[in-house]
Amino acid sequence: MVPREQAEEAIVADSNGKEEEVGVMGVSAGEHGADDHHGGGGKFSMKNLLWHGGSVWDAWFSCASNQVAQVLLTLPYSFSQLGMLSGVLLQLFYGFMGSWTAYLISVLYVEYRSRKEKEGVSFKNHVIQWFEVLDGLLGPYWKAAGLAFNCTFLLFGSVIQLIACASNIYYINDRLDKRTWTYIFGACCATTVFIPSFHNYRIWSFLGLGMTTYTAWYLAIAALLNGQAEGITHTGPTKLVLYFTGATNILYTFGGHAVTVEIMHAMWKPAKFKYIYLLATLYVFTLTLPSASAMYWAFGDELLTHSNAFSLLPKTGWRDAAVILMLIHQFITFGFACTPLYFVWEKVIGMHDTKSICLRALARLPIVVPIWFLAIIFPFFGPINSAVGALLVSFTVYIIPALAHILTYRTASARMNAAEKPPFFLPSWTGMFVLNMFIVVWVLVVGFGLGGWASMVNFIRQIDTFGLFAKCYQCPKPAPALAQSPVPLPHH
């Protein structure tokens, strides 16, 4: 087995070769295949600046912008269910736990890729995905589990972005109901089929994070300026169902690394990804903690019936700007969630190595249709996050990576020949295994068990209250018009 340094060099070499050869990734031969070009020694072009992203910074922007998105608007709702102290502590707890499992995924990717490269396998015209890593390291049953959970999570992750688009635009233009806006934004988001891979999200990731940063600080400042209305109460937590629903939404918030492998594969040096997700999470804390805390302080228990933070803030130009920027970012995040699904579908129908972007876009369109349909059936912005977090995120990005790491390195020979040794802050294999088992047990019991129970109770309650295919979820009821009949003229 190649040691860690050689494994990294092998990965870099293959990545560069891939970028020179794969036109479908948006990079042509000789354009910037050499590593010294990526370092700044080659010819500058606007196309490279905006379209070809594979640096450490590109990966950081992708992770940070993909992680926060629309959950920024539902975290105040979660704080009202949890209370201030639990809300802050659980954000920190799940943020660091998510960073650890993202690290495990990156280690397993490097292990899989270094083994395959030693066997002479080429990844030209092929994007490695998480289920393929599981297949290569642990066999077909793990591949099936990874494929099922990952694809279902990404499917509903895309659904959530579409629901959020309709929910947000309603606060600018309420002449159309949220269901109609879902139809419109479903068509708009379908244009993501033309973006070949994560390699081509450079400018979008940068803009997306900037937009989310504006929205987060708008929420915090607007809430503080609004102040506490008279009679505001902060009673959370009051019910176990609400508590674990809120906790699971936070688990969902910091479980956005279902696309980690695809982001790594788009890097010029994938082995440098290890701590990027942690650094992205630290930045995300500066957005989520102030905004959620300020909103809960200002509005308290009112948030229990307002899952979208925008709904409680006064309509101003600042709010409209935040809504518009969040809409654009949700379009970007929709693409992030859908792109791995596009890859899977391409591989199923044999179109993954097709070089024509238009043909691939046409082949991808069937993926958008079920997303569109599900967003119309379940328009429950907020509660759906918790349900997806408990039933899908708990396995996809917490339990499966932790178990996969334990089983991959369960033998002494596997540990001795590992492409990545334990990190400096936890230099013991035993320590890593103990931490992994803690994550498995915690998420299985608290996230999937209690969180699943609470989230499904809350989700079913939304169906009972609003019904499937709800036309305008949580929209304010129009004031009843006073029927004023004309006064009859006296007869003479």
Swiss-Prot record:
Family to which the UniProt record says this protein belongs: Belongs to the amino acid/polyamine transporter 2 family. Amino acid/auxin permease (AAAP) (TC 2.A.18.1) subfamily.
Segments traversing the membrane: 68-85, 88-108, 144-164, 181-201, 203-223, 241-261, 275-295, 323-343, 365-385, 387-407, 433-453
Location (main, coarse): membrane
A Gene Ontology biological process term: amino acid transmembrane transport
Name the record gives this protein: Auxin transporter-like protein 1
Chain's role: Carrier protein involved in proton-driven auxin influx. May mediate the formation of auxin gradient from developing leaves (site of auxin biosynthesis) to tips.
Keywords, comma-separated and alphabetical: Amino-acid transport, Auxin signaling pathway, Cell membrane, Membrane, Symport, Transmembrane, Transmembrane helix, Transport
All ranges on the Cytoplasmic side of the membrane: 1-67, 109-143, 202, 262-274, 344-364, 408-432
Cellular location(s): Cell membrane
Residue ranges, Extracellular side: 86-87, 165-180, 224-240, 296-322, 386, 454-492
